[in-house]
Amino acid sequence: TKGFKSKWFKNKIKIKEDFIFDKEKDFLIFPEIFAHFAKKLCIDKNISYAIFALNGYTLKPTNDYKNLEDSYKKAEFILSVSKDITKCVKLAFPYCSSKIVESSFTINSANFNLNRAKSNLITYMPRKLPQHSELVLFFLRKHLPKHWKIKKIHNFNERKVFHYLLKSKIFLSFTHFEGLGMPPIEAALAGNKIIGYTGEGGKEIWKKPLFTEIKNGNILDFVNEIIINIKKKHHLKKINLQRKMLAKKFAIINEKNNLIKMIKKIRLK
């Protein structure tokens, strides 16, 4: 959408109003969902570019495979934020294997004050798989103790999302075909036990005891795991250690270092 600017977080992003670029000065980075536009905007005009793959399951934004293949072949490099995305890129575009550059995103653990008192609250985000979340709640309804509540997080700004994640004890993950979904990671850093789908990309961080994987669509296992965890006493020492490792993995220093590497690659042009 023309002029679109995210309202989910504060930003001062400058928006370019045209598609006029200088091949001597400009370097474009396309998200994978727009990779096929590189042919018209860059290849035909001899402008350097890269592709930022944020999700391995959205690498097919067009049925024009020739255009898409050309866009990946001519890209200077391909940025990837997870092991799963890297595998997907290598499988879809084998000739790009040597061009893949590791990237990352930051989740600031300082946003999560774990000294705040927790409530007997379960949170979830239904946006990706609403039918799944509705079924889980339906089967859970007669087994949830009266002193436990469930909160749907939907269309909230960042501040409100963090507010409820910090209050809850359990977060239900309904991620679906994600490169590496942020909500389960944020929920884990906010002090939640995570139960649910990995979205595939989440497999690299989905380790017990902090995370429990449910196979996509296995509603009954999902419900039973929630019931077990409501009553269960968790190994806090192991969970806290795992949470610290997670915070370290998504620390801002890692993203900065990866950005510096990327900028150096661009400057070599």
Residue ranges and their predicted role:
Residues 83-92, 99-161:
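Conserved catalytic-core segment of nucleotide-activated headgroup transferases in glycan assembly
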Residues 1-27, 162, 182, 195, ...:
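N-terminal pre-catalytic "stem/leader" segment of glycosyltransferase-like enzymes
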Residues 176:
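Aromatic "clamp/platform" in nucleotide-sugar-dependent glycosyltransferases that forms part
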